A protein has these predicted regions:
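Hinge/cleft segment of the Venus flytrap/periplasmic-binding protein
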Residues: 301-364
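Periplasmic-binding protein-like
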Residues: 44, 100-115, 134-138, 247-258, ...
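Flexible loop/hinge segments that line or gate small-molecule binding clefts
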Residues: 128-154, 283-285
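Extracytoplasmic "Venus flytrap"
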Residues: 42-63, 67, 76-90, 187
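Hydrophobic alpha-helical segments within soluble ligand-binding/sensing domains
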Residues: 151-175, 291-313
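An alpha-beta-alpha
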Residues: 64, 159-216, 314-341
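C-terminal motif of bacterial Sec signal peptides marking the signal peptidase cleavage site
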Residues: 15-18
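Structural motif
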Residues: 75-97, 220-243
């Protein structure tokens, strides 16, 4: 009797742990097996070939991962290799938003990709139908419709105006603006800011022999379409710099073109062309002037707001006045003398205040 009971118990256990139906094995759940995470998920979609630019987009990546570690979140960051691949990512994003209306997992989608504005605005209404999905659309001055997501704009006009006003003090009078394309508002407003600051005569720098510095400024676009021009090939960058060096020897290059600008600046350093090249988004130790955009801090701020009971504001502007952009100087003894001679403290303050005022005027 005892052996029969033991047999029945063993048989029952076998049925519970490894019964088969149509050849498929059904396993008893393992209590030690990790369960799928229900932590909030942050998904980031970049522009074409954006990551690896060692400036703006890499700063976004850094800010996202710091926030993920701080708040115990999950992240998925996607950098497409073509416009079409980026569009496919966005299509998947909107499909997921529609398909997860009953899901309790919170999801934040961050889009920092120029060139998809019309498509994003046409479909953003889907976020209004999903209480647990939110959209943060970066670098647009125009808010989304109510309930369809949040927008963040970090204008570069003010800080570029300030940098443009400072540059002549270091006897950089031949300036070339390299702009990614003529359609993306962010880089073109930055170019406008630099132009306005550079051409404003706050002071009159002179050469050692007494002649007044004459200013010359030219703008050149790398590509024609929105979203393009931010990551040109190495060979293209080399040929471009070779061409520019024949015309702008000892000139100053202001690269408003993402990763393309980093390639140009690196080539300036190793080829000894004599060209200066402004640092953009991050501090470049080899350059006199760098213009910083603290986008890593900004996305961290937005994620913290998203997790808060109040949520993210509908639209935020974080620029020079708010301390999210700034000019960083790296001056040796000679440059320090020039700076103090032409731009004393009271004039520095005036330039800074003018830059803030003009940036705010462009935001209205």
């Amino acid at each position: 009797m005892m052996s029969r009971c033991s047999f029945l118990i063993l048989l029952g256990c076998l049925f519970l742990t490894c019964c088969t139906k149509d050849g498929d094995t059904i396993y008893q759940p393992d209590s030690d097996e990790p369960k799928a995470s229900t932590a909030p998920l942050v998904t980031v979609i970049y522009g074409k070939d954006a990551l690896g630019d060692r400036s703006y987009n890499d700063l976004i990546y850094k800010g996202i991962e710091e926030a993920v570690a701080k708040y115990g979140l999950r992240s998925m960051q996607m950098s497409p290799t073509s416009y079409e691949e980026g569009l496919a990512y966005l299509q998947t994003m909107f499909q997921t938003v529609s398909a997860t209306k009953a899901d309790t997992i919170r999801r934040l989608y961050i889009v920092c990709a120029a060139g998809y504005d019309e498509y994003i605005r046409q479909n953003a209404h889907l976020f209004a139908e999903n209480p647990n999905a939110d959209l943060l659309y970066l670098e647009t001055p125009d808010p989304l419709p109510e309930g369809c997501g949040s927008t963040l704009y970090m204008p570069y006009y003010g800080v570029m105006y300030e940098a443009g006003a400072i540059i002549p003090a270091f006897l950089f009078n031949e300036c070339l603006l390299l702009v990614a394309n003529p359609e993306d508002e962010t880089v073109n407003l930055a170019a406008k800011g630099f132009t306005d600051g550079f051409l404003t005569d706050y002071y009159q720098p002179k050469y050692d022999w007494g002649d007044i510095l004459e200013k010359h400024l030219e703008t050149r676009y790398l590509e024609d379409k929105s979203g393009d021009g931010y990551n040109i090939a190495d060979s293209t960058a080399f040929n471009l710099l070779s061409e520019l060096s024949e015309v702008y020897f000892f000139g100053y290059i202001v690269p408003l073109c993402g990763g393309s600008g980093n390639k140009i600046r690196y080539l300036c350093d190793i080829t000894m062309t004599g060209n200066g090249c402004m640092g953009i988004d991050v501090v470049v130790p080899t350059e006199v002037v760098s213009v910083l955009k603290h986008i890593d801090r900004a996305v961290g701020l937005c994620i913290g707001q998203w997790l808060s009971p109040e949520g993210m504001p509908k639209h935020q502007v974080l620029g020079l006045k708010e301390g999210y952009t700034e000019v960083a100087l790296n001056l040796n003894e000679g440059y320090t003398t020039m700076y103090n001679t032409y731009i004393p403290e009271n004039l520095r303050q005036q330039i800074h205040e003018d830059a803030i005022r003009k940036e705010e005027a462009y935001g209205k």
